[in-house]
Amino acid sequence: MGRIVKVLSLVLVSLVLVFGTGIAAEAKKKKKKVELTAEETAMFDKWEVKPKERAKAVKDMREKPKFVGAVKCNGSCHDAYYQAWTKSPHGGTYNLLKPGERKEAKLRVKLDPEKDYTTTPLCLRCHTTGYSQKGGFKPAGSKSKKGKDTATKIDPTEPNKEQVGCEMCHSVAGGSQMRAVMKSSKGNFTKAETEHYGQRWDYANVCTRCHTHKNTPFKPEVHDKYKFNFEERKLKVHKIADYWNEDNADQKLEKKDERAEQVGQTEKTPLLIEDFEINDKGKLKFTKGTKPYNSKKKTYNYKK
């Protein structure tokens, strides 16, 4: 009898290991349902988003914005733009921080041309994507509180957060929310809708974040080439026409011209530009009251 009980016990244990107790499955069934607001429902209706896809999309749109990297913008969405960007000055900004790069320019502003600046906070702020912000670039040597390596992995064949990517110019605090909007709407969105989820359209303003910042050593008084003209510089950023092909032709932005006629709130009233400094511990800190987005209140801060 004892032997039979023992065998039955072993069988029962085996069944539990294979199929589980059913508790996890039951918990999964009771997963909290996502309730959409009237505004969200109307927006998804307009975009004709399938009911089963709405919960995931709205979850991403409600979360705090974070940087996701230029590679996320590539693939089935913006391949031509990504390819053009990799060949642009912004697609190689991190490389300029390496020893031996741009020797003449560095000597001109009294920087050591043989020094490695790829972990220097003041440089990383403007030479990478989202440094010192949620989801942003983390240099070599970065560790979590538990000592885990958190440095951003760099693939030389696929530029990403280590360069000045899409989000540095097109988003307020990272493109995670906006990416959900683009995927759900399939490009059928207005400027106002995108601004609600972190897109910015004040490009001439946002460029001053780095190109004319008080801490940049590359000032006009050093050399005329450092005079910043937005209209001239933007022509070097996206030479898209050279990168359309049969594989990405279906990604052309059908609503681009239509949106160009719209005027976003950020175009009427530009957002604040973050000021920053390096503290006594050598870390980059944003000056209080200068951020364009308040993540706690979920509000945007405009220039007065």
Locate each region found by the language model.
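Short, exposed beta-strand "edge-strand" segments with a Pro/Gly-rich flavor and a Y/T-containing core
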Residues: F19, P65-F67, V222
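Repeat-solenoid scaffold signature
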Residues: N188-K219
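Substrate-binding/catalytic groove segments of enzymes
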Residues: G175-M178, N215-V222
